[in-house]
Amino acid sequence: NTCEDIVDIKKEVDLPVIGIIKSVYDDSDVYITPTMKEIDALAATGVEIIALNATDRPRPNGLDLDTLFKEARAKYPNQLFMADCSCYEDCKHAAEIGFDLVGTTLCGYTAKTKGTAIPNYDLLSRITTELNVPVIAEGGVWERGQLQKVFSYPVHAAVIGTAITRPRDITRRFVEAIS
C-alpha cells in the first residue's frame, strides 16, 4: 500500500506487481489511487501495473474517472492500468475508456454492491465473455475450491489477498468455524 512496500517487493520478487496507494480525502469515499498525486508516486516506483478505483463514485475534488484516466494515460502512455471495479457497469466503462485490465476488486464494497457474495461468479462469467479486456479476479477467494472455480472462467489472473495476508482475519475464520 506504499511506494516503499512496492520498491521492497520488486527487489525480492520477479513477478509483475500491482501497485495501489490508499489515500483518504474528506470529500470522497474513493481511496484506492484516487488522484494524479498517487498515480505519479506509483509510476515513479516502476511498478508494472497501477490499479485505481474505477467505480462511478465521486472522486476527490469533484474529479471524474474519465478525466483522471485520460490525464494518466497521456502522462504515462506505456504504463499498464488496472480498473478496480464493483460491478459489470464499472468494468464495461473501464474497458471502453481504455484500461488495460479490469478487476472485481470492489465488488461487495460499494453501496451499490454491498451484500453481494464474493467471489462474484456471475460477474466473472459476464465480464470474461462480454468484454474484450483481461480480467483479474479479486475479492473473497479463501478456499482452494473457490480459486478453482474462479479459474473455470477465462480470467487472466487471480489475486489472493486477505486469505493469506491478514493473520487476524485468518484466525477469526477458524474461531468462527468452531464456535
What are these regions (language model features)?
Residues 1-18, 29-36, 54-74, 88-93, ...:
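Active-site-adjacent beta->alpha loops and helix N-cap segments on the catalytic face
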Residues 13-27, 73-83, 128-138:
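Short beta-strand/loop segments at the ligand-binding rim of alpha/beta enzyme cores
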Residues 18-20, 100-107:
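Non-cysteine beta-strand/loop elements that form the S-adenosyl-L-methionine
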Residues 27-41, 86-98, 131-137, 141-158:
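Catalytic cores of alpha/beta
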Residues 39-43, 47, 52-53:
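Extended substrate/RNA-proximal surfaces in nucleic-acid metabolism proteins
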Residues 50-52, 82, 103, 159:
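Conserved beta-strand positions in the central sheet of alpha/beta enzyme cores
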Residues 69, 76-77, 151-162:
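Short, electropositive alpha-helical surface patch
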